[in-house]
């Protein structure tokens, strides 16, 4: 009776509100309510959007937090289930974390959950893009997907772990959020190692559409000139604005990076201020 009522810690709570009780990297019971709310939007984008012929350009911007809410999903489609069991799939596809000779270490539940939610989000976005193709609005649409940050201390790639003399060991991929751009009538996939920041988003969005764009709030030109050369950045643990809430950043350790961020030689420790 005890094991029946306990049910791996969920106590037979409603499936949409019971937190996952994981068992290793392949099995989970329960769901993350925060994930379901965000994921459901991506899953139903084709039902929430419609294509129509107009004589003017259109602009759509949306924010979604699916990849902020981690949980295991059911493979191979990476969909949420109350009972997740990927044991067989994981055994048969253990090589899926290696690409072009580079292997991502996905051995802990925290790492696997991050992998799953990103797979689920990208697959659902891909389904929406298929819907756009079917309705003739994919090629004439510029699409930009920008994330706000990487996964903190995921430590999946050995060559991205920096050992700074004063700051200690850091996973620099914390500061490498996803940035994808699909231009008008583009085809195929391309990886570009050009140094980019999220501030490049409006530059790319208006490229070729608005001549010499200006920020309407500041009156300054919208361009990427400021990212040339070494870029200072703060690696602060105080991300919560209830703690870091002054007019300046709370004291923390500063670093700089330039050009290819995947070359640890381009990272430098500065000081603490």
What are these regions (language model features)?
Residues 1-98, 207-209, 218-224:
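Active-site-proximal alpha/beta segments of enzymes that process anionic O-linked groups
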Residues 16, 20, 28-36, 47-53, ...:
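Membrane-interface soluble catalytic domains
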Residues 36-49, 53, 84-142:
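A long, amphipathic alpha-helix that forms part
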Residues 172-176:
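Short, solvent-exposed loop/turn segments at the edges of secondary structure
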Residues 67-69, 105, 149, 161-167:
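Histidine-centered active-site/metal-ligand motif
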Residues 71-75, 153-158:
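A short acidic (Asp/Glu
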Residues 62, 104-108, 112, 120-123, ...:
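Proline/Glycine/Serine-rich low-complexity intrinsically disordered segments
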Residues 59-66, 115-118, 142-147, 181, ...:
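Short beta-strand segments
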